[in-house]
């Protein structure tokens, strides 16, 4: 798999999402039992940290992905995982276009149903799933709601489904690598006495911004 290859080739796995999708990057980043070569691209401008409505407007702007990209050390042959439930907004689409142009393998985690029922907000007319080397469908219905209460939609499923998919990929990656006898670059829990992740920090901190 792409994640396993990244570990064996000493490449970085970059994870990007806007709005609530960025939480899937946090789920994978510097996490107990998680891979140390994962770089969560966390830019306050496109999350809720600097204002929810503000972030919702900014993720539709073209030109921002390039600015965010330049804040990170991203190299050819790295892996890029982009999460967007709708797959339509300009920033994730533009980030996908940039990743492909720079020679990265691109994984998209998205709702195919939602994507098929909306128009792209990027000038290319492309949606995220159309640009990826590998598409992971979270199977969440259009509108990101799993329940109906007298006509009121609720029960958002994209974050839960996305985290489950991401952690399942992690588990399969570790299973594959361990079967091949590869040393696993995995964080231990800082809340268990005797933990020591210093070797992992020293190896990756120069390449991973928020570590």
Where are these regions (language model features)?
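Glycine-rich phosphate-binding loops that contact phosphosugars or nucleotide phosphates
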Residues: 14-170
């Amino acid at each position: 798999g792409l994640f396993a290859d990244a570990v064996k080739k000493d490449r970085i796995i970059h994870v990007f999402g806007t709005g609530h999708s960025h939480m899937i990057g946090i789920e994978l980043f510097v996490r107990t039992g998680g891979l140390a070569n994962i770089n969560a691209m966390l830019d306050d401008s496109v999350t809720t940290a600097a204002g929810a409505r503000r972030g919702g407007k900014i993720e539709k702007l073209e030109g921002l992905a390039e600015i965010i990209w330049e804040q990170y050390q991203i190299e050819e042959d790295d892996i890029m995982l982009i999460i967007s439930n709708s797959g339509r907004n300009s920033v994730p689409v533009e980030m996908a276009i940039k990743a492909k142009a720079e020679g990265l393998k691109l994984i998209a985690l998205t709702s195919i149903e939602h994507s098929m029922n909306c128009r792209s907000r990027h000038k290319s007319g492309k949606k995220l799933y159309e640009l990826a080397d590998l598409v992971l469908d979270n199977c969440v219905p259009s509108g990101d709601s799993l329940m109906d209460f007298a006509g009121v939609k609720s029960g958002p499923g994209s974050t839960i489904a996305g985290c489950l998919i991401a952690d399942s990929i992690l588990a399969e990656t570790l299973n594959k690598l361990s079967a091949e006898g590869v040393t696993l670059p995995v964080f231990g829990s800082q809340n268990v006495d005797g933990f020591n992740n210093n070797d992992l920090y020293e190896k990756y901190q120069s390449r991973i911004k928020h570590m």
